[in-house]
Design a protein with these regions (language model features):
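Cysteine-nucleophile active-site neighborhood
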Residues: 1-71
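Amide-donor transfer/coupling interface in amidating biosynthetic enzymes
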Residues: 55-176
Length: 176
């Protein structure tokens, strides 16, 4: 954690400049202000509007969440002991948990979107099962680059996502 905190200013500058970043589970938690483990507080990078508190048990299982980034729910597998609490002005990645627990099991949200950052508990693997998530990150990086070569690639041309959609559909079938 000390090595990461030493990079706090660099990470914050990258994020504030619109850099693209996918943070899953522990890295998502550490982008927030802090992680509380009982009475102990671990300082986070403070680049996203969130805090995490360790729960008494782990939240484990398949998860699906509605998101504004795709017509179908994003799917994954969650396995986390932390309960992430977003600030009131934060934008969740998952606006409604369909199955699973999401950030904390209480508020119905999963993950967070801030500038070019996606923070999430969607393991398993998130990008191949949710091609729109990969597309969002790529498009965001190209927009940030903002030169003729990058601009020529926007909007992204549709790819053959047959295998990705098959992986997504297989994950959906695992849901209770």
């Amino acid at each position: 954690a000390h090595e990461l905190l030493a990079q706090k200013d660099k990470v914050a500058a990258y994020v504030e400049d619109g850099g693209s970043l996918l943070a899953i589970c522990g890295s998502y938690q550490l982008l927030g202000r802090s992680y509380y483990m009982g009475e102990d507080r671990i300082e986070g990078l403070g680049v996203i509007a969130a805090e995490t508190v360790r729960g008494s048990d782990r939240l484990i299982g398949n998860v699906a969440v509605k998101t504004d980034l795709a017509p179908e729910p994003f799917v994954g597998f969650e396995n986390h002991g932390g309960r992430t609490l977003l600030d009131a002005d934060a934008t969740p990645l998952g606006t409604s948990v369909v199955t699973g627990t999401g950030n904390n099991g209480d508020d119905g949200f999963e993950g967070l979107i801030y500038k070019g950052v996606i923070g999430t508990y969607l393991h398993g693997p998130a990008l191949p099962k949710n091609p729109e998530l990969a597309d969002w990150l790529i498009a965001h990086a190209l927009k940030r680059r903002d030169d003729a070569q990058a601009t020529a690639l926007l909007p992204l041309k549709p790819l053959n996502d047959t295998y990705e959609h098959a992986a997504h559909d297989a994950a959906m079938k695992l849901l209770p």
